[in-house]
């Protein structure tokens, strides 16, 4: 490379020795602006021109360096901007925000300012690219330049320039000309040969690509006044540096200089020289390294020497000096002077004015202009260039509109929170199809807010949860007497004959009482059956209420009471306070209060049992004398013991034993206190009766049902339960399980007088022997919400028809805890949980009564019938015990589990073993053909192994 002397200085200062040289040019000064990218530490893009700044030069954003070669008409302006790598690094170090979009927008706006200054003060703009290919991002920059010039600058720049010393020199276009843009690529592709043909071909291809893009986006147009830039029509405007090393290693340059000083050209060798060379120790000795003088430069070498940036630039400078700058670039030439060559002084004056308007005043934060357009330019320049921001904002708004439309389109008249969340999720998916970018998060928040307000605008459902956890679907803003979830269950009546549609209950009364009373009117069997009357609350005043916390929920304070007062004192205090309570009434004579005595004396009326044949049973068995109705004194003692000890699993399994023999021995009666249980008539029990709730508080309504649906003959073990009698049973699961029991009565010697009083019928009955073979049929019925009913053969298996009937008996269901919930075997996509709803008992034709004492363990509660005297089922009859549909403890509704794990089927609750007991029928009752009285006594349970 040949080095020439040049001058360099920083704008706006002009060296004293350079100003006269520039003034000598008069109106032949061509200003060339150099912009673009650089990678060196000095931000120098002038390396292609063989120019370098001083070593002490410090790059800065917006700084302008001027270069001039004496003897030329070209003034080079080097613009340092954020596209220079070193300047961008400085901005990164100054950056405090982590928002990349904001940082990128600021860097781009600062570069656009420098480009605007170059377009209005230069005749030729040279864009230097460090890459090997054209960057399409420059097209976007040019579009922004065109937008800013046409929408902002032309609104204020010509007017403001007239107010400066520049006056009307630049005219209405406010620039010297439509600047011609040239492209210089510092690096040539490595995979392309560096020959004249390949270099020219590559340059032409790049020119075609650039021209096509500029014409496509209206950067270069047919009219000079409407075009942002100009491209020469018949001249090269793309240059690739294929030969020259722009930033060589200085050490290598020093070595090359040393070799050049030692270089000596070969001359024609004489014969004497040949003789001298023959004396050399080896070939080439003392022969200089270099080309022979006869060697001439090839065409490729000549092309490389002439293919320089300076020569490339001077061809376009020459067009400007000759006045043919716009010829060939535009088809339509403007009437105004298209091109102006100014002297240095005039140009410098215009440069100062334009620089102050476009760059200088922007940096002054206190500057205020009276021109509204110019003030808007100073204030909103960066925002107006942030097209990505507008683009992301437009996408977010478009996605927001589609998301809101999708939400409203799928919205019903009223809907709940679950539907709202699902529709909002669908609307979010619709939004994400369009909306993205930095505004997506704000748009999503707005979408959520708009959809929420739309939902709350009269479309919100009540959503009060039912006892099964289903929300109410009635409008929230409209008053309604009762809730409705819209969920309908199929359920049977008390006797099981009629199936009906049950609305999802919201109160305990709806679940356990009202529905069955409604079905009793519709069922022609329920109106005929004899039902056991459970004790319920009978108010004595009009303003009765639910029991207070301490009275209604004694379970929470039981431990404190047990520690505070002894058992004996508690009994005496209770008797003393009984007469002083005006809101209480004594129980009937058939329900005497149990005496708080030791268990040995309290159980005098219960009969000891002895099981033979190795049977394993768990039930209550007793014989009753004349005073049967006085034998219920142990009821409260038993409940107190169970409450203290907790719910225990008394079940034992007997898979092989099918017969049982029970020995009944009537005990001698003893005198008992006639204590009375004080039943409250002003406060009722809000929940279900359980082991620790006491007997002084009664519920408003019975949650259980016990009914005799007919004689035992209505059930045939060969056909099972017929559809006309019990509807809804699954095929093969409509059978009861047999329970074979042998009972032996041992009569003590002091009862001989009582035996003589028995009638002949009883005597004939006794003559058959002291053993009675009883066949009882038992069934544990489960019912799912779809109305499917089935019996269980064991705690783990459903009854499957004839084969199970022949092989199994009821020992597995009697001697084991039965689960309260079990998966329904019906074929459905979703597994429904069936609930234990009924217990079927077919009593035998024998002088014994079956006693029911169900205890349902759910969570920490053990629910009972709440009777002081246990129900005693009559002989030769079909009895059905209907269990509660919903269980409520002291202060909570116990919801059914969502699913039952096969490894722990009792987790959702169970009915404890020891449900059934057997008692001998009184002799007086045998003489009467009617069904025994519905006043029974509680018996003490025993387990035998």
Swiss-Prot record:
InterPro entries recorded = SMG8-like
The family database entries (Pfam families) matched by this protein are listed as: Smg8_Smg9 (PF10220)
Kindly state which keywords UniProt assigns to this record, in alphabetical order.
Answer: Nonsense-mediated mRNA decay
Q: Name one GO biological process term.
A: nuclear-transcribed mRNA catabolic process, nonsense-mediated decay
**First and last residue of the signal peptide:** none
Superkingdom of this protein's organism: Eukaryota
The yes or no answer to whether the keyword GTP-binding is present is no
Q: Answer yes or no on keyword Secreted.
A: no
Q: Which function does this protein serve?
A: Involved in nonsense-mediated decay (NMD) of mRNAs containing premature stop codons. Probable component of kinase complex containing nonC and recruited to stalled ribosomes.
Name assigned to this protein = Nonsense-mediated mRNA decay factor SMG8
Stretches the record annotates as Disordered = 563-604, 633-671
Q: Which family does the similarity line name?
A: Belongs to the SMG8 family.
